[in-house]
Amino acid sequence: MNVLVINAGSSSLKYQFLNVDTREVYAKGNCERIGIDGSFVGHEENGGPKQKLEVALPDHRTAIKHVFEILKAVDAPIDGIGHRVVQGGWYFPESALVTDETLGWVREVAPLAPLHNYAEADVIEICRDMFAQIGNVIVPDTAFHYHMPEHAWRYALPRDVVDTYHVRKYGAHGTSHRFIWRTVHELRGDKTHRLVSCHLGSGASLCAIEDGKCMDTTMGLTPLDGLIMGTRCGTIDPSTVVYLNRVGGYSIDQIDTMMNKESGLLAVSGRSSDSRDIEEGAHVGDEHCQMALEMFYYRTAQLFAEMASSMQGVDTMAFTAGIGENSAEMRQGVADRLAWMGVHLDAQKNAVRSDEPRVISTPDSAITCMVVPTNEEYMIALDVAELLG
Ligand code: AMP
């Protein structure tokens, strides 16, 4: 089955066209600057060179038309479309076929993720209307966390506030964490009942997974919570918002921008949100970069222990996403701060670069540590195949 996976943002639209059975990626790309001057499509076919096609993309409808036009060059029919949805709210315990009802849900919960859900809902509607013969599936990033125990998702706020505004932990990166569990389980079977999946990219979250079920995760109502990220501050005292507003004179919108776009590794290092630049700075003695790394290791190890505690133990730790898959130094930094839990990496194995899932801990490590490249598009395509198959 051939599936087109779409990941729409407010001014961008990423796509990947792949075969679920062979995992072959026929083509992938992204439409950038939709609705803004200078829009273009970056497109790659069968691992070939990336082409930049400068086209006017006044809206998402035009972008989708372009994507379908470009994909005509691929000699394979589109059998289904999978839509990544950032926030499924209290509605989606799993992926679902697009209907008037499910599309309505995506819009209803959009105030929780306004930058993403509105655009995603529009794109889903456009695809459904333009290509009525192709099945469309909604794959919410929160669905995997839906069944977290109540003691993990409930916020200790007044019940009527929680109920009226649906303020609770929803988590994010669920599709990636689900893929990591699936892969680790395929490789390790019953040796892993309790996994902490560590998705460390420009956005970062940990997820405690026991026998395939999410027990807790570090992101909360929104993807701002938890770990220190590229430009996001992660968990801080919530009163900071009130204080900055009342005493600092910052508006709520300014604080929102500050905490999401101007904080995290970027703010602490004063150099970059990219871990490669920060590692480089730290190596040449930049103290701010050294502190950014130290804080990243400290918080990641601390929250790892929190995730382990939610399962009363942990068998396997899996690193994934941009930092988790590529930075041996960051993996080592986190693992060093977990030596008290019996985590020990094999330095040689940790240094290996590969696209394959692999073990990087020593045989006597109390927790098996792995690197597992994530593949959210494939996971989405699998859901499409299951629901349409
Ligand atoms: P992601 O959001 O998963 O695409 O991850 C993006 C982040 O991963 C970048 O901002 C970098 O900090 C980090 N990253 C990507 N590639 C590498 C690499 N080769 N070495 C170290 N860090 C990397």
Question: Language-model features: where?
Answer:
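Glycine-rich beta-strand-to-loop/alpha-helix junction loops that act as flexible
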Residues: 8-9, 84-88, 200-202, 314-326
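Phosphate/pyrophosphate-binding loops at sites that engage ATP/ADP/AMP, CoA/4′-phosphopantetheine
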Residues: 67-79, 186-189, 304-315
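Short beta-strand-loop/turn "lid" adjacent to the catalytic site in phosphate-handling enzymes
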Residues: 71-116, 135-137, 143-152
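Glycine-rich phosphate-binding loop of actin/hexokinase-like ATP-binding domains
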Residues: 144-247
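Catalytic phosphate/nucleotide-handling subdomain of diverse soluble enzymes
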Residues: 210, 216-251, 257, 321-352, ...
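A mobile "lid/hinge" subdomain adjacent to the ATP/sugar-phosphate binding pocket shared
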Residues: 248-292
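Internal helix-turn-beta structural module
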Residues: 290, 294-315, 324-389
